[in-house]
């Protein structure tokens, strides 16, 4: 069961809350980066969490040719317009990209509960096959009305 707690209060007899984290997820709209735009401009975009690689997506291009649904009027037509909405997820057994396994990195390996922060990095590796850069869209650009989102799923 996944709970979205809006308010939780503690009394003297129960001064803490125990929870289990079964997965963590990162969702974002992104694409390659080329001069102006180029729909055929692949880029190997990798995500790391706490220094561990969780998976790479090969973006097929830097998308243009039509306006992004959310782009402001002042944004030039010949620039990057939109991306693809991608979701990386790490659970107790594997890492996935859009529900397809991309690595064997697990939640336990990320040491989420023993660190004072969660470090997330997105980029293109120096030794990537396709080094086409990247565009990362917020909720007012592209086609998907969302900023980059990190979700930590938990169970009580």
Regions found by a protein language model. Name each.
Residues 24-26, 107-109, 114-127:
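Short, well-structured beta-strand segments within conserved domains
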């Amino acid at each position: 069961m996944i709970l979205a707690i809006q308010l939780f209060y503690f009394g003297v007899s129960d001064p803490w809350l125990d929870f289990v984290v079964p997965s963590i997820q990162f969702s974002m709209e992104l694409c390659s980066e080329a001069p102006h735009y180029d729909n055929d401009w692949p880029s190997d975009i990798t995500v790391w969490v706490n220094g561990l690689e969780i998976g790479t997506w090969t973006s097929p291009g830097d998308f243009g040719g039509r306006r992004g649904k959310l782009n402001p009027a002042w944004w030039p037509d010949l620039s990057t317009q939109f991306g693809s909405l991608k979701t990386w997820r790490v659970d107790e057994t594997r890492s996935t990209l859009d529900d397809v396994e991309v690595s064997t990195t697990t939640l336990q390996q990320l040491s989420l509960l023993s660190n004072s922060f969660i470090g997330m990095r997105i980029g293109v590796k120096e030794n990537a096959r396709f080094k086409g850069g990247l565009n990362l869209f917020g909720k007012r650009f592209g086609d998907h009305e969302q900023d980059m989102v990190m979700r930590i799923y938990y169970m009580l």
